[in-house]
């Protein structure tokens, strides 16, 4: 009899929870319409995989890319709408969040074509790869719009779990297995420290989890200057540091880059930084409003270490993957300048502008490396010597992307850095901007060193990889070259037409 009553209570409770969830989705589903499109795409991929045959594999790419493009379109139609908080305060929709979601979707859309040929050649499971990419994209999008501590913790875990699996996707490769394990351990440590900081915020604010309510709770409890807030600040900064991978939290980055598939590295190197930057901006700006001087100091230290160590260590690398890993550490140092400047001097607008250019520069570089790696099987920088003599288009594309990463005019990277540094200078961050300028000059050195190798015509310097270089006849090359061409153009042209881009970025401010 007791068991029967308990069973009835369980059914009633489950039904009540389901009805509440259905009610929330029914009345708030339109606010997450771009995310719902990706969820529909995931379901469609699973259904199609269970009924399709091997020859239908191109449809998987089509479904994934179409869902991403439709999701981008839905975001664009929602642009400039009034900010809305939905799902009982758990999710916020505004221009600032949507621009970061757009950057993540754009990166995912451009990354999928990079994986086509490699997966076809190795006969790896295509459905699982695309499912992980779409799920990681979904997690990143929810993180950008998260408005409470629980969602801010769960959403990046959705992203991270897929990233752990993607980093170890080539299960027979020992380096890939090692990269996946190292990434899992470091990511788990970062998440644990992050949630520890959240617990201090939750307790100090009187049990509040929404970002704005945490500020009100700290005022009501008079705990905004307590030691607990200092512990929360340190824990959250360290936890976010593992996600953004600035120095000194960068140790896992080169090893994971080197051991993982190139197209995953291209995807992860940007989406993780975009999502974590959006999350860091909201947490630090709102929940830790009363400790702004302290977190400014912490971020300044991280930015200086990242710009110096990232660019210095990149000079010594012989692997293209590891060089780009250390380069990305330096790049996140520049992005942190925009976070520190904040809303007052167009800091967020400069950060968004630079991230948009960084997507094209970085993805263009990775597209070139993917093509070269597929045709030669090597990742060594020395083996790029003389590539211009065999494939001028690929060599010039790689050179343009590297020069844009270095920040040489009139390419997009120059104008992105110029705007970022100018905003930092206007905000009084003279020392930080000076370090950024010096390290940018330093980065040009190792980028030019690679370009010099590309353009050399001396036979004694050309390795057998380039001497025996052949273009692949596979039709899927077109998709990689298309992504590469789009990224090269985007790394070059926007420098000439900055005003519309700046206007869009400034529209996103709070």
From Swiss-Prot:
This is NAD(P)H-quinone oxidoreductase subunit 2 A, chloroplastic. PANTHER family: NADH DEHYDROGENASE. It is a multi-pass membrane protein. One of its GO terms (biological process) is ATP synthesis coupled electron transport. NDH is composed of at least 16 different subunits, 5 of which are encoded in the nucleus. It is found in: Plastid, Chloroplast thylakoid membrane. It comes from Triticum aestivum. GO terms for cellular component: chloroplast thylakoid membrane. Its EC number is 7.1.1.-. One of its GO terms (molecular function) is quinone binding. Belongs to the complex I subunit 2 family. The gene is ndhB1.
